[in-house]
Amino acid sequence: MNQGQQANSGGGFHAEDFATLAKLEGDSFWFRARNQLILWVAKPLLRADASFCEIGCGTGFVISALAKEMPLVKFSGTELFGDALPFARSRVPSAQFYEMDARRIPFRSAFDVVGTFDVLEHIQEDQTVLAEIHKALKPQGKLVITVPQHPFMWSHQDERACHVRRYTRDELVGKLKKAGFSVNFTTSFVSLLLPLMYMARRPARVDASDYDPVADLRLNPIVNSAMALVMTVERLFIKLGVRFPFGGSLLVVATKV
């Protein structure tokens, strides 16, 4: 799930955290809403015999959703933290999973589509990762990517999650072009909730030793349901052609050129 600076520090997730994450992410409004957007952009890119690889697949939450919708696609996933992979394998037994560093991807011209979802922000050498993904894609292959957005949203939560950065749209688009991609589609999401997100991230700093990496998923059920409804409305706007300029996250689709 989360690579990069964690590879250097050993911080962030521990083995027991992945078990908790696997239990909670299915009910989280944020994970469910992100999955719906990923499905929406990925389905037109994946014919029945296509190959898809998720870089930083974590517990397999995204791949499992894609595989349910597109059972004939050949799925695989890579993950830096081997403790997460048993959960991914149990969710999608038909997929191939590899313990791997995103900065050193051994595949060459292997996949029709690569996805990486809230992974790149953890990696200091993000340009290296994009270049490795470019090599792993077939000619004219597609990359679907999500990242946290807006440096002004930086807070102790980013530090505790071992983020290296939050992106601007121009920064990510520029890095994709430098790596050899053309950008086909961008939109912000978690846009309607951005004011609430901003206010929630203002409290005083919390010591890293007190960090619970899955605490944000333990929302009051009523609050979680209300936020899920807002995200559903937002997704409808995006499907109708609205491209939000601001939002907690950024979704991009790019093509290998």
Summary of predicted features, one role per range:
Residues 181-191:
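Conserved S-adenosyl-L-methionine
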Residues 22-24, 143-165, 169-174:
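Short, glycine-/aromatic-enriched active-site segment of Class I SAM-dependent methyltransferases
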Residues 196-228:
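C-terminal helical/coil "lid" or tail adjacent to the Rossmann-like core of SAM-dependent
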Residues 117-120, 146:
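Residues lining the SAM
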Residues 127-142:
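A short glycine-rich, Lys/Arg-flanked "PGG" loop and its adjoining helix->strand segment in the class I
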